[in-house]
Every structure is written in C-alpha cells, then in structure tokens.
C-alpha cells in the first residue's frame, strides 16, 4: 500500500487539508457568486454607457467628415464655376478682338479698293487726254475705255458687302422698365427734386393701406410707392401695371381726404397719377380713363371753396388771420392738377373708337362735368384762369367726341354756350388785377400746371420750400404771402394765353354748329359773335395798333375765326339780319374794313412803307437786324437786293393785315358775303363813297 503513494498523492492530500469545512465552503461559494453577479451588473451598465458614448462620438465624427467633404465639394464647384466664367470672359474678349480686327481689315480693304478705283478713273482720263492729243483713232480710245470699264466692273464685283452685326449681349429695355424710369425720374416743372424725393420727406399721421400699398404712420411715402413699382414691373404687363398704379394712388388719396391727416401729399400724388397716365395713351384702357376722370372730378368738387372766392372783400373781415399760405398752396395745386388730369383724360378719349367714347359717359360722369363747369365758368365768383382754360379745353374735346344723345342735349349745350359768352364779355388783361371784368392771373396763382404754364413760374420755388429735406414730416413748412409782381414779358404771355382761350371757345361753337346746325344757330349766337368781332377789331385798331406786342398776330387769327363762325351761323339762321339789329352799324363798318382794307384796294398815291414804319417801328428794327444778318451771309448783290425786297414786302403785308384785321382770302370772301346780305347794292355804293375819299 505504501508503494502506491507518489508525489502527486501527497499534493492532493495537502490541498484537501487546506480546504475549509463543507458548510463553510458552501457559504463562501454563495457569497462569492453574489459578489461576482453584482460586479458583473455594474460592469455591464458601465460598458453599455461607454458603448453609447462611443457610438455618438462615431456619429459626430461621421457627420463632421461628411460636412467637410460637402464643403470641399462646394469649394471645388465654386472654383470650377470661376474658371468657367473666366474662360467665357476670355472667349468673349477674344471674339470681340477678332471681330474688331475683321472690321479693321474690311475697312482697309474697302479703302484700298476705293483708292484703286480712283486711280483707275484718273488713269482713264489721262489715257483719253493722251489719245486725243496724239491724234489716235477713236477705235483705240473706245478699246481703252472698254478695258477700263471691264476693270471697274471687276473691281466693283470684288467689293465685299459689309453687314451690321447684332450685339447679342445688348439688353433691350422693356415697356415696364421704361415706365419705371418714367415714374422715378418725374419732376415738377421748375423743380430740382423728383416727386419721389419729395414724397420721401412726407409722412402720414395715421397708417394707411391699399391693395399693394402699406404705409405705417410716420414713415415716408416715397419708399412704399417705389417698392410697389418694382414689384409690378416683374409681375404684370404695361397696361395692367398702369391700371394698378392709378388704382392704388386713387385709394391712397381717398384715405387721406377722408381721414384727419393733413393734405400734404395730395398734390404730389395727383401729379404722379398724371405722370402715369401720360406715359403711353395706347396702354390706358377706357375703363381706367373713366374711373380716373370720375375720381378727379369728385376730388376737384371737394376744393370748391377755392372756386367760390367772393368778388369783393367783405367789410366784416378784420384781416387779422396769420399771413401764411402753405395750406392754401396745397389746395390750389391739388385743384390745378385735378383739372389737368381731367383734360388729359378727355383728350386721350379722342383717340379711342366711337363705341369706346360712348361707353365712357354715363349719368354720374355727366353730372360731374356739369358741376365742375358751373363752378369754374361762373361770374358770381372770382375766376381762376388756370381752371377756366382747362374747363374750356374739356368742353372743346366734348364737342368733338361722340357722346350719348340723351346726355349731350341741345339744352345742355345752350347752357354751356351762355357761359362761353360770359368769357367773351371779359377782356384779357393783367393791367388791373382788381378788375373782375378781365381775365387775369393772380400773383398767388403764378404756378405751372401739368399741361401748361400760364405765367412765368416765379413762385415755383415755394413748392420745394414746403418740404423739409432733413426730416420726414406730416405737415408742410411755413410759407408766407409774399409774391413778386408780374414782369412785362409775363403779362404779354398771359395775354397770349387769354387770346388762345377765346380762340378755343370760337372753335367749340364752330364744331357745335357742324353737329347741331340750325338748332344752335339762334339769334343770341349771331348777336354775341358780331359784338365780339366788332370789339376785337376796334381794340386792335385803336388800342393795339401801335403797341409793341407779340400778340397782334394772334388777335388777327382770332378775328378770322370769328368771321368764319359768323358766316356759318349766318348761313344756318333763317332771318340773320334781325338778330344783329343792335350792332348792325358796327358790324357793317367792321366787315367793310375787312373787305376793302386790303392792299389791292389801296390808293396808289399812299406810301405803305411809311405807314408800316409809323405803325410798328420796333418790328421795322427787327427786320433791319435780319437784313444785316443776311448781308453778312450773302455776298452777292443780287441776293442782298432780293432779300431786302422780301423783308420790305413782309413788313407792308403785316401793316395791311393789322389795318384790315384780316388777311386770309377766304375770310374776306365770307365777310363780303355777309356784308352783301346785310345791305343792298345801293347802300354798299353809298357806304363806299362815304368811307373812301375820292
């Protein structure tokens, strides 16, 4: 048994001896297992946390890598784009340079061929002269000329035809862009600031909003309007763009007039509407013209206190009001601009079709026209010549338009004609500004309109003085009532506008006679026409004959138009002689001067050159100045003598025209026909013997 034990058995016995008892060993095993289990749980939780962090870190690194790759890709694309742009620019410059070189070569080739052609022509001439001098036969000369002609044809055939190439990089400006420039650069007459610049310094006390305009309180008006134009440019065609601009401006003006805000921006907005309307008449539809005319007439009626200024100052007024003018200036400008817009609307309507003209008018439009006419053409209040002129032009356009018969009746035109007769009874003069029987412009109304300028625009600087260029305000700057007097040139200018006003009234009556005929050719028309003609001729011969005025020719033209009107009304009336009983003698003398005052009936013993010198010496001086200028230009004595005779004949013709009050042959024949129908042949002979010295 002892032989069976070895060293391995001894090791096993020692290991068993060192082990604890079985119960104690089981407890230790269980506690060790629990400890190992807790440790494993804690290590598993920590491992999972580390795994999540590692995963998030890996995702972050992946995202950073992808973003870096995208950034590099974008940089590569941008560099490629820059290289492509540089390549295209270089290609364009190369093509332009090549094109210029080709043009230069073609020009040089053309010049060389032209020079060769000239040399061939000179060579031919020299050969022909040499053959003639040497006495060569004509056959040789013909052969040489044939050879030269063949060379010339060959040269002409070899010429390269040049064509104008198209510039593909040129950008053609569209209608909307032109309209935008037209609106942005708009300035009032005599003003240095654009209307948009003025509106940039004007604000509203309360906010206002339209379909495409949103204006906060205290903010300038110019920027929203400019932004609206920029948006419309890229969204709509020209006609729709103009309609939307007019609609939004009208809505904005209406909100200002109905609210409690100051009317500071109203005249500038109305002027902006006029500018939009005047860009291209063909792009404005009839319904837009109708809406704009109705809006302008309603707005003008709101300013009727300006049109109802009393003729005489009330003795009850103490005159202690402040000497400021800015608010009256704003209302005056708004009134002038409204009438200018109405006038432009009816003038554009003349270019439309007859159906469109009829569709323009309705009862509301016609009532507004009647109301505006009653306010502007009145004798109960002080007349404003700017407004009167616009109203007469509106009536002139209405007389040429095709209007509905139920609205444009003979009775309505009779009332309008009676107001025109009131204008005939008022002379045109600025000599006395307190005389209400004259048509004149007051110094406070010496402002330019949108269609015309009746004065010299002396007060135009006051419009810019309303604006504070360093701030944005809702009220205007203070303007005092201090107006300079009219100059002599300005008075002559206003007189000329007044004569044009009278001429426009005569044209209205002529047009109405063509339309209605005998219905309007009543006794009052004949009486007023004869009375006006006699007065104008007397004024021309007695007062204006020796006056140095540029309006004498216009007065003669007015007299000719009155003779035509008198003749047409005379032909339409059944018993015209009874209508002129009160002014018959004056009319006979007037017509006699027209018929027999021509140079063909002049006494041969008189000296017309002396009469012309006595009549208007200043005109003779102007002709002498022209003669001196012609002498400096022409050196030939024959030409100088011819020009001297022509200028002298022109001076005599002007003298004869002023003496007779008429120079047109047709007018003399019309006056002769009327004169013969007034008096008999025996009375004509007696009158001739009484008025012509033997």
UniProtKB/Swiss-Prot annotation:
GO annotation terms (biological process): chromatin organization; DNA damage checkpoint signaling; DNA repair; establishment of protein localization; telomere maintenance via telomerase
Keyword Coiled coil part of the UniProt annotation: yes
Subcellular location field: Cytoplasm; Nucleus
Region (Disordered): 1-26
Coiled coil: 68-130
Positions with biased composition (Acidic residues): 1-13
GO cellular component, one term: cytoplasm
Keywords (A to Z) from UniProt: Chromatin regulator, Coiled coil, Cytoplasm, DNA damage, DNA repair, Nucleus, Phosphoprotein
Gene Ontology MF term list: damaged DNA binding
Transmembrane segments: none
Principal location: cytoplasm
Pfam families: LCD1 (PF09798)
Quaternary assembly: Forms a complex with MEC1.
Annotated function: Forms a complex with the serine/threonine kinase MEC1 which activates checkpoint signaling upon genotoxic stresses. The MEC1-LCD1 complex is recruited to DNA lesions in order to initiates the DNA repair by homologous recombination. Required for cell growth and meiotic recombination.
Protein name per the record: DNA damage checkpoint protein LCD1
Organism: Eremothecium gossypii (strain ATCC 10895 / CBS 109.51 / FGSC 9923 / NRRL Y-1056)
Origin organism lineage: Eukaryota, Fungi, Dikarya, Ascomycota, Saccharomycotina
């Amino acid at each position: 048994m002892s032989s069976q034990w070895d060293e391995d058995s001894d090791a096993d016995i020692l290991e068993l001896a060192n082990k604890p008892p079985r119960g104690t060993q089981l407890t230790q095993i269980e506690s060790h297992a629990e400890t190992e289990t807790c440790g494993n749980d804690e290590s598993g939780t920590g491992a999972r946390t580390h795994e999540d962090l590692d995963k998030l870190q890996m995702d972050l690194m992946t995202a950073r890598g992808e973003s870096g790759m995208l950034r590099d890709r974008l940089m590569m694309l941008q560099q490629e784009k820059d290289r492509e742009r540089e390549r295209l620019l270089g290609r364009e410059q190369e093509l332009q340079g090549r094109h210029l070189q080709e043009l230069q070569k073609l020009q040089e080739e053309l010049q060389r061929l032209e020079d060769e052609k000239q040399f061939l022509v000179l060579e031919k001439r020299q050969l022909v002269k040499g053959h003639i001098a040497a006495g060569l036969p004509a056959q040789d000369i013909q052969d040489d000329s044939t050879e030269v002609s063949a060379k010339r044809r060959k040269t002409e055939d070899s010429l390269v035809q040049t064509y104008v190439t198209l510039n593909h990089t040129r950008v053609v400006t569209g209608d909307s862009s032109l309209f935008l420039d037209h609106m942005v650069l708009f300035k009032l007459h005599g003003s240095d600031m654009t209307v948009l610049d003025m509106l940039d310094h004007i604000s509203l006390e309360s906010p206002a909003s339209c379909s495409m305009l949103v204006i906060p309180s205290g903010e300038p008006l110019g920027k929203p309007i400019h932004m609206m134009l920029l948006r419309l440019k890229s969204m709509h065609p020209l006609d729709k763009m103009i309609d939307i601009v007019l609609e939004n401006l009208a809505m904005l003006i209406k909100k200002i007039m109905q609210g409690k805000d100051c009317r500071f921006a109203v005249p500038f907005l109305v002027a902006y509407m006029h500018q939009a309307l005047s860009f291209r008449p063909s792009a404005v539809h009839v319904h837009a013209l109708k809406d704009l005319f109705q809006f302008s007439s309603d707005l003008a009626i709101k300013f009727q206190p300006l049109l109802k200024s009393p003729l005489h100052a009330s003795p009850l007024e103490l005159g202690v009001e402040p000497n400021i003018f800015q608010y009256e200036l704003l209302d005056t400008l708004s009134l002038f601009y409204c009438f200018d817009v109405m006038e432009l609307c009816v003038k554009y309507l003349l270019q439309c079709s007859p159906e469109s003209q009829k569709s323009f008018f309705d009862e509301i439009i016609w009532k507004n026209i009647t109301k505006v006419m009653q306010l502007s053409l009145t004798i109960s209040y002080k007349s404003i010549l700017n407004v009167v002129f616009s109203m007469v032009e509106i009536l002139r356009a209405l007389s040429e338009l095709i209007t509905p018969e139920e609205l444009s009746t003979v009775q309505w035109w009779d009332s309008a004609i009676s107001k025109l007769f009131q204008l005939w009874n008022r002379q045109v003069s600025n000599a006395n500004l307190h005389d209400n029987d004259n048509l004149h412009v007051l110094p406070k109304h010496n402002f330019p309109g949108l269609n015309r300028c009746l004065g010299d625009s002396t007060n135009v600087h006051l419009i810019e003085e309303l604006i504070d260029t360093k701030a944005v305000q809702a009220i205007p700057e203070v303007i005092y009532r201090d107006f300079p007097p009219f100059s002599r040139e300005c008075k002559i200018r206003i007189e000329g506008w007044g004569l044009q006003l009278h001429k426009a009234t005569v044209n209205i009556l002529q047009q109405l006679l063509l339309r209605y005929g005998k219905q309007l050719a009543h006794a009052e028309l004949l009486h007023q026409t004869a009375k006006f003609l006699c007065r104008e001729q007397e004024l021309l011969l007695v007062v204006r004959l020796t006056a140095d005025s540029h309006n004498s020719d216009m007065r003669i033209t007015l007299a000719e138009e009155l003779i035509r009107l008198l003749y047409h009304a005379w032909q339409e009336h059944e018993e015209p002689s009874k209508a002129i009983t009160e002014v018959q003698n004056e009319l006979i003398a007037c017509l006699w001067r027209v018929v027999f005052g021509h140079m063909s009936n002049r006494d041969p013993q008189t000296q017309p050159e002396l009469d012309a010198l006595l009549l208007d010496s200043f005109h003779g001086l102007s002709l002498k100045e022209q003669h001196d200028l012609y002498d400096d230009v022409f050196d030939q004595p024959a030409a100088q003598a011819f020009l001297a005779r022509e200028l002298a004949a022109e001076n005599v013709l002007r003298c004869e025209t002023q003496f007779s009050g008429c120079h047109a042959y047709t007018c003399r024949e019309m006056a002769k026909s009327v004169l013969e129908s007034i008096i008999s042949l025996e009375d004509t002979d007696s009158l001739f013997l009484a008025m012509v010295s033997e």
